[in-house]
Amino acid sequence: MADTLCIAHLFDEAVQQSKKTLQMDPNFAIGHYELGQAFEQKHMHDQAIAEFQKAIEVSGHSGVFDSNLAYVYAVLGRKEEAIKIAKDLEAQHDQNPSAEANIALIYVGLGDQDQAMLWLNRGYEARFNPSILLRPAFDPLRSDAQFKDLLRRIGLPR
């Protein structure tokens, strides 16, 4: 539910929902991930980093958790850390079916739209789950003609 609230740009509600979820199960990695996303969109970067790190701590590394952590690093200007995670994910992308979109997310945070679109198009060719494109983190690409074309090809609203 918190994920849907974030997509709707209802970040305060997403924080509340995530906190309720984590009250029921403090070790629920997805709850920490969703709380991290909401915090990031509220520009509460330190809290977002803590939540993504907690998600990684309780469940191990995953492309989703690692890429969201790298996205926050990128937004904060911690480019070396973000790029290191991106390169690690790039090296493993053949074993991870959603890696392309996760890598693209990092490049969005870095402000590199060309690399973001390169990875999103690779994801499209690999038949990735396009729901990630609804996330607010991809808002900086919404005016890009290539991104609009990708959404059209997928059948998502532009």
What residues fall within each predicted segment?
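Alpha-helical protein-protein interaction modules
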Residues: M1-R158
